[in-house]
């Protein structure tokens, strides 16, 4: 939920961002486009990084980072810096998107993996939809900055809950990060 709500919450804000930052409608699509591109790039690396440092630590780091970056992006008055935070959000979102299914595969009993994967995937869809809806409703009543702060605070609560409730990996085995493993993965 948290990762894709963070990614897509800017979509209903695009016209407001265009007015606030004095940019074109095309440029107002950059926050979502750049964060999605950064997500795609991050997905290549975060799986390998989690092979070294563990699944839960990467996912926890990702969730807290995304929440903090959302909070930061709400107070940035400069377009280029706002865009940079959106790129960082895309990169950090990949820490959950790439690792969660591996965690499920390693830690959930084989008979329950399908159900757990379904819950995760439905959570991502609900997150993407609810991020858009929540932001869209909020910006009808409050500023885009306040809406972003609220979504960031919700994500911070989710990250904290995740940290305390997700069990530590029992079946994880660390592997060193090697360029050869990265190359052979392709």
Please name every model-derived segment:
Residues 1-25:
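Extracytoplasmic
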Residues 167-186:
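Juxtamembrane intracellular "pre-TM" segments in multi-pass secondary transporters
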Residues 41-79:
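Conserved MFS/SLC helix-loop-helix module at the cytosolic interface between two early adjacent transmembrane helices
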Residues 4, 8, 90-98, 129:
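Small-residue-rich segments within alpha-helical transmembrane domains of MFS-like 12-TM solute carriers
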Residues 85-124:
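Cytoplasmic helix-loop-helix junction between adjacent transmembrane helices
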Residues 81, 110, 119-166:
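Helix-loop-helix hairpin linking two adjacent transmembrane segments in secondary transporters
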Residues 8, 36-44, 128-129:
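Residue-level signature of mid-helix packing/kink "hotspots" within the transmembrane helices
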